[in-house]
């Protein structure tokens, strides 16, 4: 009578199967613990999208999660990358005490692209915030419009607007 031996019971095949199992386990473990793409990559992509959509916009330096932007309608502009308690934010300033329509257009277009909401909503929110600054209310106003946090400051040196959205909203 012939005796059949199982292939998995031979010592050579046992060690080979163990080696293959170990290799698959290590490969899977490395794949799961591999570093994911950094948030700055998404922020850089967003800045490139802004330059493609807004004529005259150029990307400047990136320092500590903030991408500085250059545009003829603004003195300073930046795109803030996400952090723990905020999503992106858009900052723009001008030297004029009464901003030009080009300034508002830049702020509205950038915020609309970053937060994927209609441009008219961001335009109205920015204009409303700046128009509310006066002697009685003060020259440093925080407002909320269409789920956006809009902070504007009006001084003798000009107007500064920051538009952001709380994380999870």
Segments from the language model and where they lie:
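Extracellular/mature segments of secreted proteins
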Residues: 49-55, 87-93, 136-139, 159-163
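Long, charged/polar, surface-exposed segments that mediate recognition or autoinhibition
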Residues: 77, 83-133
